[in-house]
């Protein structure tokens, strides 16, 4: 899943048993990882409130939460782990800058951060919140399980805590499946964006171009998006092959399919890194 907290950026060690609940919470709240968790919590709560009230305030608040959480994880990944540039010689500095830029261009977190900023400053499109809501659900649950409950409430044994056991089983069972759903949802969002452009909604063509680039980059770097495309292709092939489908529709479909296959051969994010696990 995208936007995971860095392992070395967690909150302080477990407070002493004699400290109050407030003191233990404040110790955890001082960490950068807690700010990351807060961002995802804002996304989760704002999305639910937006679904209930359809208020623009909650829509924009959700994307501010996305920007906070993804911005923090990008900061952790690219700006806190490397040797400071000012301590390197010229050649090492140049190589370090190139490495950071290449990493930023291929980062899924950067991609989602850019997209969130785009959705924030364009007309509301409610379906666009679905992937970010899904991310927020699992990130909030993981943080509650790994940090809040054990470090603040001293619930650390899955055998004795039904809450921890439930969260752990839920995340293990549905995390990977949810990422497949996100890939499918993003393709559905693209179809909706395409129809909005055809119907000439406000800024719809700009949104279509930007989201098409997003889908292309996601396809290049995400196994879940590739799986979603493959699933859609199999289903569409079955529908189009039906004898009742007119020949001109079949020809048009095959032409579009072949064009997409050729397009997939061109990478916007550079050569794939085979040694890294895809997200």
From Swiss-Prot:
**Could you tell me the keywords of this UniProt record?**
Endoplasmic reticulum, Membrane, mRNA transport, Nuclear pore complex, Nucleus, Protein transport, Translocation, Transmembrane, Transmembrane helix, Transport
Cytoplasmic topological segments: 53-56, 146-180, 222-279
Q: Which InterPro entries match?
A: PER33/POM33_regulator, TMEM33/Pom33
A Gene Ontology BP annotation from the UniProt entry = protein transport
Which cellular compartments is it found in? Endoplasmic reticulum membrane; Nucleus, Nuclear pore complex
Task: Give yes or no: UniProt keyword GTP-binding.
Answer: no
Q: What else is known?
A: Present with 1680 molecules/cell in log phase SD medium.
UniProt record similarity statement: Belongs to the PER33/POM33 family.
Name of protein: Pore membrane protein of 33 kDa
Q: Where does this protein come from, organism-wise?
A: Saccharomyces cerevisiae (strain ATCC 204508 / S288c)
Q: Which gene encodes it?
A: POM33
């Amino acid at each position: 899943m995208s936007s995971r907290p860095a392992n070395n950026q967690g909150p302080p060690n477990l407070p002493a048993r004699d400290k109050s609940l407030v003191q233990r919470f404040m110790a955890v709240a001082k960490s950068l990882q807690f700010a990351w968790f807060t961002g995802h919590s804002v996304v989760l709560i704002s999305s639910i409130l937006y679904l209930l009230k359809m208020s623009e305030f909650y829509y924009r608040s959700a994307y501010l939460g996305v920007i906070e959480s993804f911005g923090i994880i990008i900061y952790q990944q690219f700006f806190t782990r490397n040797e400071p540039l000012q301590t390197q010689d010229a050649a090492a500095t140049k190589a370090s800058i190139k490495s950071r830029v290449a990493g930023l261009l291929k980062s899924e977190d950067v991609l989602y951060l850019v997209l969130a900023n785009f959705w924030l400053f364009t007309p509301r499109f409610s379906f666009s919140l679905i992937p970010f809501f899904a991310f927020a659900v699992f990130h909030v649950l993981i943080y509650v399980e790994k940090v809040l409950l054990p470090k603040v409430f001293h619930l650390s044994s899955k055998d004795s805590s039904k809450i921890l056991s439930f969260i752990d089983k839920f995340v293990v069972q549905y995390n990977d499946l949810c990422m497949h759903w996100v890939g499918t949802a993003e393709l559905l969002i693209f179809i909706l964006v395409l129809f909005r452009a055809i119907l000439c909604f406000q800024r719809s063509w700009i949104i279509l171009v930007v989201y098409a680039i997003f889908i292309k980059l996601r396809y290049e770097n995400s196994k879940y998006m590739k799986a979603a495309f493959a699933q859609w292709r199999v289903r569409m092939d079955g529908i189009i092959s039906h004898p009742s489908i007119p020949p001109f529709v079949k020809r048009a479909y095959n032409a579009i399919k072949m064009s997409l296959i050729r397009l997939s051969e061109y990478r916007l994010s550079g050569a794939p890194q085979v040694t890294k696990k895809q997200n």
